[in-house]
């Protein structure tokens, strides 16, 4: 007669532990999926912001005004109609207050000595003034750029989720007066937020705003993001050629 040894139920206990651990892991799965989806949305928002930033950076590489883009003039300071008086011409050398002498940053003038003025807002926009397109900042006013894949504006037939991405650019003049302090005599000034005040007359500040929108049936995928920047009427340096 054989004696059968009694075995402890170790295997059963291990099975129970395994089931409990798997249950805990599965309970966290929905939360992990939710966080993964949110991370994807954040990633697409960051891509949109990066696209906006690149577009604004491109605009800021252009000349401040159409007059600056004219090759017969150095990219110098322009006279404005509605700017702060303390930022105007201060002496016969056509310097602005605070500019060292000598400097290329002088007010531009034509051959007759007449000061060159910044463009009117009525001349803002693509090819409005009849000159080369997109050679200065205000040419981008009203420009609507469509981001697409290989020319497909709807991205149909691709696996790209974001589609119908549009970037609309607005360029305006902004107030350049200080809230407190003096440009010429004070070491500290408090400056008004220029985007709170857009003007139809020319000033020393151009405000650039680019708004990105997407059209998507899913609410969480629709975007309406705006980035802004400004550029000042401060002229530019020009390279000198030394005779050897």
What do these predicted regions represent?
Residues 16-20, 37-46, 53-244:
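Flexible, low-complexity segments enriched in proline/glycine/serine and punctuated by aromatic residues
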Residues 2-36, 48:
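N-terminal single-pass transmembrane signal-anchor helix
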């Amino acid at each position: 007669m054989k004696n059968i040894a009694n075995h402890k139920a170790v295997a059963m206990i291990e099975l129970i532990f395994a089931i409990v651990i798997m249950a805990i892991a599965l309970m966290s799965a929905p939360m992990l999926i939710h966080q993964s989806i949110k991370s994807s949305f954040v990633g697409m928002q960051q891509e949109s912001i990066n696209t906006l930033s690149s577009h604004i950076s491109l605009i800021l590489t252009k000349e401040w005004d159409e007059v600056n883009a004219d090759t017969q003039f150095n990219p110098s300071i322009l006279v404005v109609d509605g700017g702060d008086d303390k930022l105007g011409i201060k002496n016969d050398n056509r310097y602005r207050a605070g500019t060292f002498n000598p400097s290329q940053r002088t007010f531009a003038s034509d051959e007759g000595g007449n000061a060159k003025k910044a463009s009117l807002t009525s001349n803002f926009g693509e090819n409005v003034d009849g000159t080369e397109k997109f050679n200065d900042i205000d040419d981008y006013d009203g420009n609507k750029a469509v981001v697409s894949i290989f020319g497909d504006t709807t991205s149909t037939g691709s696996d790209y989720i974001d589609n119908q991405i549009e970037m609309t650019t607005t360029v305006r003049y902004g107030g350049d007066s200080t809230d407190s302090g003096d440009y010429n005599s004070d070491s500290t000034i408090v400056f008004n937020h220029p985007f709170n005040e857009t003007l139809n007359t020319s000033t020393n500040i151009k405000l650039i705003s680019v708004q990105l929108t997407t059209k998507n049936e899913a609410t969480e995928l629709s975007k309406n993001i705006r980035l802004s920047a400004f550029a000042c009427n401060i002229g530019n340096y020009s390279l000198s050629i030394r005779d050897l």
